[in-house]
């Protein structure tokens, strides 16, 4: 997005679609929307265009597309995490953390080096 404050002013539009606006939710410069309550079904992340956080997330996504074997491994990791976390997002995130950090670093190097 071009302006976070404009997004904040219009977050009611996302809420009208059933999303809960959660603000930065742990990542400065991000706006996070979640749908489905405890058993989250959808999520939307919005960043300032060109920000480091946006580039980091896009690089990871593009890396997974370029390397389907890594995407498959990530998918298995996510399914395993969902099965063991008992809807505890902190447990789920810790389960994926080392994989994400390793492959995010590779993705940034792959995209920008």
Which residues does each PLM region occupy?
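Catalytic core of pol beta-like nucleotidyltransferases
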Residues: 4-11, 15-113
């Amino acid at each position: 997005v071009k302006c976070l404050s404009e997004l904040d002013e219009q977050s009611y539009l996302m809420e009208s679609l059933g999303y809960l606006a959660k603000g930065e939710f742990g990542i400065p410069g991000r706006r996070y929307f979640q749908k489905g309550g405890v058993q989250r079904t959808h999520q939307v992340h919005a960043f300032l265009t060109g920000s480091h956080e946006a580039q980091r997330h896009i690089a990871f996504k593009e890396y997974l597309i370029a390397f389907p074997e890594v995407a498959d491994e990530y998918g298995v990791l996510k399914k395993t995490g969902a099965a063991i976390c008992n809807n505890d997002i902190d447990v789920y995130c810790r389960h994926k953390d080392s994989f994400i950090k390793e492959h995010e670093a590779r993705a940034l190097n792959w995209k920008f080096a």
